C-alpha cells in the first residue's frame, strides 16, 4: 500500500475544474459503483487527479477521509496503487478508494440518497421459505413507503423461467427496474448502470430471499463498492432459520445494518412535520407480523 496521502479536504481548495482542457489525455475516473470519462492535461500528477475526482464526485465524498488513487495495470489485470511520481501520459483507468476502512457505520437514511432493493420474491419460493407470507406483507409495506417518498426501487427475479415471477401481492407500480438474473447477487451490470444514473446514492435498503445466499452476496458486493447497506430483518428469510440467523450475524459483523421495516420508514421521514409523515404513519399503524423471524435474528 502506498504511503498515506493528504485527506481529500486538504486538496480541495483549488485546481482543475470539471471541464478539462481540449486535447487532454482521456482517463476513466471510477469511484464506488460509478465510472465517468474525462480528460486531464498531459503530465497531470496526483494533485490534479484528486481535483478531477473532486469535480466529478465531490458531493459523494467524505471530505475528511483519506483516499488513495489506484491505476488499472494491464500486466496484472487489476488495480495497483498509483506509482510515486506518476504522471498521465496515455489513456488509462483510475479509481479512488478509501485508504482505511470505516469502523463505525452511522446508518443515516435520507430519501434522496437511498435506493430499495427487493430480491427474488417469487412464487416458487412460497412453500419453501420460512414465514414467506409475512415477508411479502412487510416487503409490500416497504414498496408503498418507497412510492410515497419517491425512492427508486430495483427488483430482481432469480431464473424466472423456472422459478416464476414476483408474487402478485407485490405491487410493481413505479418500480425503476425488474430484472431477471442467474447470478445470486443483485449487482448486475444493469443495476450498476441504474445506480450510476441516480445522483448521490449512498444507501441501499435490501430485503427478500434468501438471506444467506442472494441477500448476503448482494450486501457484501454493495459494501465492497462503498454503498451502505440496511437489511430489513422482518422482510428477509431463508428455507432454514439457522442459515438466516448466521447470515445476519455475519453481515452485522461486517458493518452492514440489520434493521426493521418500521425503523427504516420512520428514519426516512425523520420528523412528524415531514409532508409525507401522515402517509407513512398510516402504513405502520398496523404493526409488522409478529412471526418467528425476529426471535431468530
Swiss-Prot record:
Pfam families: Isochorismatase (PF00857)
Modified residues (N6-succinyllysine): 278
A GO term from the CC aspect: peroxisome
Keyword Phosphoprotein: yes
Nucleotidyltransferase listed as a keyword: no
Highest taxon of the lineage: Eukaryota
Keyword annotations: Phosphoprotein
Phosphotyrosine carried by residues: 159
CDD domains attached to this UniProt entry: YcaC_related (cd01012)
Similarity-based family: Belongs to the isochorismatase family.
Official protein name in the record: Isochorismatase domain-containing protein 1
Protein's organism: Mus musculus (Mouse)
Source organism phylogeny: Eukaryota, Metazoa, Chordata, Craniata, Vertebrata
Amino acid at each position: 500500500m502506498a504511503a498515506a496521502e493528504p485527506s481529500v479536504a486538504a486538496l480541495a481548495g483549488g485546481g482543475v475544474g470539471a471541464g478539462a482542457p481540449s486535447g487532454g489525455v482521456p482517463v476513466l475516473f471510477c469511484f464506488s459503483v460509478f465510472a465517468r470519462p474525462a480528460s486531464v492535461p498531459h503530465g497531470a500528477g496526483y494533485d490534479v487527479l484528486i481535483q478531477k475526482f473532486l469535480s466529478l464526485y465531490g458531493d459523494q465524498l467524505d471530505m475528511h477521509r483519506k483516499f488513495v488513487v489506484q491505476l488499472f495495470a494491464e500486466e496484472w489485470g487489476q488495480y495497483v496503487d498509483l506509482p510515486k511520481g506518476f504522471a498521465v501520459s496515455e489513456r488509462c483507468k483510475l479509481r479512488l478508494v478509501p485508504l482505511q476502512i470505516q469502523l463505525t457505520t452511522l446508518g443515516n437514511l435520507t430519501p434522496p440518497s437511498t435506493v430499495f432493493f427487493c430480491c427474488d420474491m417469487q412464487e416458487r419460493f412460497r412453500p419453501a421459505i420460512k414465514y414467506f407470507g409475512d415477508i411479502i406483507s412487510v416487503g409490500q409495506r416497504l414498496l408503498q413507503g418507497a412510492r410515497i417518498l419517491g425512492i427508486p426501487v430495483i427488483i430482481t427475479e432469480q431464473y424466472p423461467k423456472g422459478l416464476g415471477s414476483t408474487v402478485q401481492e407485490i405491487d410493481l407500480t413505479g418500480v425503476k427496474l425488474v430484472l431477471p438474473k442467474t447470478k445470486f447477487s443483485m449487482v448486475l451490470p444493469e443495476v450498476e448502470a441504474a445506480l450510476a444514473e441516480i445522483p448521490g446514492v449512498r444507501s441501499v435498503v435490501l430485503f427478500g430471499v434468501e438471506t444467506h445466499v442472494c441477500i448476503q452476496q448482494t450486501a457484501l458486493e454493495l459494501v465492497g463498492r462503498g454503498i451502505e447497506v440496511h437489511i430489513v430483518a422482518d422482510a428477509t428469510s431463508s428455507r432454514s432459520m439457522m442459515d438466516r440467523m448466521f447470515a445476519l450475524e455475519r453481515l452485522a459483523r461486517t458493518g452492514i445494518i440489520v434493521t426493521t421495516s418500521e425503523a427504516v420508514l420512520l428514519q426516512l421521514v425523520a420528523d412528524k412535520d415531514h409532508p409525507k409523515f401522515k402517509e407513512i404513519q398510516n402504513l405502520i399503524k398496523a404493526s409488522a407480523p409478529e412471526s418467528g423471524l425476529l426471535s431468530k435474528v
